[in-house]
Amino acid sequence: MKELSSAQIRQMWLDFWKSKGHCVEPSANLVPVNDPTLLWINSGVATLKKYFDGSVIPENPRITNAQKSIRTNDIENVGKTARHHTMFEMLGNFSIGDYFRDEAIEWGFELLTSPDWFDFPKDKLYMTYYPDDKDSYNRWIACGVEPSHLVPIEDNFWEIGAGPSGPDTEIFFDRGEDFDPENIGLRLLAEDIENDRYIEIWNIVLSQFNADPAVPRSEYKELPNKNIDTGAGLERLAAVMQGAKTNFETDLFMPIIREVEKLSGKTYNPDGDNMSFKVIADHIRALSFAIGDGALPGNEGRGYVLRRLLRRAVMHGRRLGINETFLYKLVLTVGQIMESYYPEVLEKRDFIEKIVKREEETFARTIDAGSGHLDSLLAQLKAEGKDTLEGKDIFKLYDTYGFPVELTEELAEDAGYKIDHEGFKSAMKEQQDRARAAVVKGGSMGMQNETLAGIVEESRFEYDTYSLESSLSVIIADNERTEAVSEGQALLVFAQTPFYAEMGGQVADTGRIKNDKGDTVAEVVDVQKAPNGQPLHTVNVLASLSVGTNYTLEINKERRLAVEKNHTATHLLHAALHNVIGEHATQAGSLNEEEFLRFDFTHFEAVSNEELRHIEQEVNEQIWNALTITTTETDVETAKEMGAMALFGEKYGKVVRVVQIGNYSVELCGGTHLNNSSEIGLFKIVKEEGIGSGTRRIIAVTGRQAFEAYRNQEDALKEIAATVKAPQLKDAAAKVQALSDSLRDLQKENAELKEKAAAAAAGDVFKDVQEAKGVRFIASQVDVADAGALRTFADNWKQKDYSDVLVLVAAIGEKVNVLVASKTKDVHAGNMIKELAPIVAGRGGGKPDMAMAGGSDASKIAELLAAVAETV
C-alpha cells in the first residue's frame, strides 16, 4: 500500500476516474445554492441531486469530485471518537444513467488494489452487501475477493423518502489485531457495529429503484436510468494510508494540533486525554471553510451551528490553558494544509480571521455573563438550603452561555454542590428532539420524470429579439407526449424561442403564441428549463396546436424591459456593495421581477444608512454615466482573466456569457440585459433587512417605480411639514426635533411630578406594617397609572427600613399588576409571587429581591392581600 499525503490521495482519486472518462466536478460551496432542503452541503452527491432526479441532464454522465462537506447532527461526539468530524471531504464517482454495478465494483477494486494506484493489499479488504443483491456478491467474487471477506448486512439498502434508491455495498479495511485484542471485530462488522479494526473507507450505492413510501420495497419500480453514487471519506483514507491511529494523526489535522501545542504549552498525546486538541482542530477547519463560503456566526440556522462550534472550541482552549483569543491564529494553518485544492481559505484569510476573532471576543464577554449566572444560581441554592444544581439550569448554562457540563460540574463541586446529570440529559434530549423535528430532510431527490427527461429535440433561445416564427417540436399534456392539443394547459418546446426561461434570478418571460392568421392560440404563463436544457413553455391553450406547425412567438416586451432594468441594476448594485462594504459581500440569492429587484448578500451586520446612501448614489452615478453594456461568449478561464465575477457555488458550462457594464461591472450571467445603463433611468433602495445569520437583503426599484418611491417619500414629507407647521420642507426636520425636545422635557417634568406624588402617597401606604412568622410586611392596594409607578413605590420603600417585605397590587384598566419586593434572604420575591399571582388569575416571576406579575381578576385583589401573611 502506498503511503500518500492527503493531497496526493485526492489527486490520485480524481486522476483515476478521469482515466475512466469522468469529468471533474469542482467542489461546491458549503452553503447550498437553490436547495432549501439542506442546511449544509453534507455529501458528495448533495450538489448533484438535479442530475439524479432527472431535472437536469449532465453534459457528461460520468462525474467525479472531491466535495467539502459539513455534518453537525452529533457535535458532542467530535473529539471523543477517532473518526467523527464536522467538516470533512467526500471523494466520489457518479454515473448518471451510464455504467452500473459491474463497472462500479471492478473499477473501484482496481483503484484500491492496482500497483499503479493505491495498491491496497487485497487480503486487507472486506465488503458488505445487501443479502438480496446477489449480483454485487458475484461481481466481487469475479474480482478475486474471497467469499469469507464478503459480509451480508440487511441494512445495506439506501433510501431517504421518495426518489432514487437501491442496495449499497461498502468496502472496509482491516487494520489488524492490534486494533482488535478481543478478536471480535469481524462479528461486530457482521452486526453492522462500528469498530476500530474494520474501518469503512468507501460506500457504493447502486441506485436502481424509484422508492415510493406507499408501497413495500419489493414493489419499487426500476428507474428509467440507473445511477451510481459513491462516497469515500478522504480523512479515513488518509488515516489508513498514512498508518495513523486516528484521523487526527494525519497530515490533515496534525499541523493544526502542533500550532495548538505552541499556543497552549501542552503536548498532544495520541494515547492520552487529547479531546480538546481534536475538538479545536476539527472545529477551526469547519469554521474556516464555512465562513469563507459566506456563512457567518449567528443565533439561528447555520449561523447558530458556527457559533456553537466556535464556543465549544474556545472552551476546550480554556481547558488547555489558552485564555486569550486564539482560534483566529489557526486559520492560516488550515489554509496552508488545504491550499492545493481549496485556495479560497487563504484568499479570504483576512476576512475569516476578522470574523473568528470578533466572535471570540464576544464570547469572552458571554463567558463572564455565564459565570455571573452560575454564581447567582449557587447563591440561590445556598439561600434555599439545597445541595444540587438542577439539570434545567445546567442545560441553560450549556445552551445559552456555551458552558460545557464539565466546567459547570467543576465549579459547582468546588462550591460544595452536586450535579443533576439526569435532569441535564432530559433537557438535552428535549432540545435534540426539537431540533430533529425542525430539520428538513435533505436526502430525497424526488421522482425522475421520464417524459421530460426524454425530450432530446434541440431548442435555441434567441437573446436579441422579442418576436420570431418557429416550428413547434414537442407538446406534453397530462405528462404525456402528444401530437396535438386544443384546450387546457400544456408544455411546449419550439425549435427556437424569444422566451427567456427562468434562471439566475431572472423571472421567465410571458407572452403569446399566434398562428399564421395572427390569432392568439396560447398564452405563455411560465418558461422553465427542461432536464436537457430546452426552454419549456407552460401555456394556457386557447385553440388547436400541433407538432410540426410554425407559430409566431411574441414576448411581453414592456415586461421584459422592466425586468432587464432590474437585472442590469442588480449587477451595478453588486459592484457597489463590493466598493462600499467590502468584497465579502457576495451574492447569496437574487430575484429580478417586473416591479422590483431583490438582492441577498453575505454581510455580518446591518448596512448603515450612510452606507446605503453611498451605495444608492454610486449605482445612480453609473446610470447617469450612460455605460455601454456588452456581452461576450467565452470559456470560464478567459472570463476570469477579464475580471468576471463568478457566483461561488454556481456551476458553469464550457462556454459562459460575460456581461460587462462599462469598466464598472463584469459578471458571468446568462440573463438578458439593457444596451446602456442609462435605460435604467433611476435606482432607489426601499428596504434593507437581515434574512438569516450573516445574510442581508436589499430590495430596490428602478425607472418608473423608483420615481414613484421618491414621490411617495416627498408626499409624506409634505404631510409632516404641514402637520408641524414648517414653512418649507427643509425646515421640517428641525421642527420635528424641536417638538421632540419639548415633549421630552414635558415627559421628564411629568415623571418628576409622578415621583413626588408617589413619594407623598408612599407615606400613607408604608404606615400599615404587619408581621407574620417574624417577618414584617406591607400589603396594600394602590391607585397608579402604570406598572412603572409600582416600581417607583418599591424604590422609595428600599430607601428606608419600613418593612422586610412589600406587596403592592394595582388594578390598571382591565389588568391586575402585582409587585413583591424583599429585603430578607428568608423571603424569595420570585417564589412568593408565583404563589400569589394565581389568586388574581395571573402568573409571573422574578429575582429574590424583586418580582412582578400580571393578572386579570380584579375581584380577587382583597383575597390576594389577605393571603400575604400565609405566604410570607
Swiss-Prot record:
Enzyme Commission numbers on file: 6.1.1.7
Cellular component, GO annotation: cytosol
Subcellular location: Cytoplasm
Listed name of the protein: Alanine--tRNA ligase
Keyword RNA-binding: yes
Coiled-coil positions: none
Lineage of the species this protein comes from: Bacteria, Bacillati, Bacillota, Bacilli, Lactobacillales
Record text about domains: Consists of three domains; the N-terminal catalytic domain, the editing domain and the C-terminal C-Ala domain. The editing domain removes incorrectly charged amino acids, while the C-Ala domain, along with tRNA(Ala), serves as a bridge to cooperatively bring together the editing and aminoacylation centers thus stimulating deacylation of misacylated tRNAs.
Binding-site list for Zn(2+): 567, 571, 669, 673
SUPFAM superfamilies, per database record: Class II aaRS and biotin synthetases, Putative anticodon-binding domain of alanyl-tRNA synthetase (AlaRS), ThrRS/AlaRS common domain, Translation proteins
InterPro entries named among the record's database cross-references: aa-tRNA-synth_II/BPL/LPL, Ala-tRNA-lgiase_IIc, Ala-tRNA-ligase_IIc_anticod-bd, Ala-tRNA-synth_IIc_core, Ala-tRNA-synth_IIc_N, Ala-tRNA_ligase, Ala_tRNA_ligase_euk/bac, DHHA1_dom
Native species: Streptococcus pyogenes serotype M4 (strain MGAS10750)
Record-linked Gene3D superfamilies: 2.40.30.130, 3.10.310.40, 3.30.54.20, 6.10.250.550, Bira Bifunctional Protein, Domain 2, Threonyl-trna Synthetase, Chain A, domain 2
GO MF terms, alphabetically ordered: alanine-tRNA ligase activity; aminoacyl-tRNA deacylase activity; ATP binding; catalytic activity, acting on a protein; transferase activity; tRNA binding; zinc ion binding
Chief place of localization: cytoplasm
Family: Belongs to the class-II aminoacyl-tRNA synthetase family.
Domain of life: Bacteria
